[in-house]
């Protein structure tokens, strides 16, 4: 979900405005990135959250240093999710063996995705990533299998026991069982 990045970014932007710091939104994003990575709650989702819609991070780093490519989407899209339980991100990304596996598989999937970036290939390679890193468990897989019959495709959110899917048609989605969010493609909103 990028919850830790969103929280760090929200706090950074809010404090900047609240105490009238002479800091740009870009600089606030850079501070949020440092907090997220140094606390071990994520590996740099802030930059993606400061972009628009579905993005591919093509160069790691904080906003202003890293780079993202926006994946164009023609339709109104919805993200469908179901969370079964949490995972401690820090326990996984600070384990050298797990981090190496995640990095190696991630680079392989990224290389494939860059050749043909689309919603369908994103979902396909995301699922392959979850399987090959051995983060996917049978309970999340069961939810993914159900979502695959109603959407463009489904995978596992990183890092958590959460299934997600993307669709342009939510008529077959049980709103009592799944959370539904519209993909916002206009970029970050500053209030």
Specify the residue positions occupied by each region the protein language model found.
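ATP-dependent small-molecule kinase catalytic core of the GHMP/sugar-kinase superfamily
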Residues: 27-141, 145, 168-169, 179-191
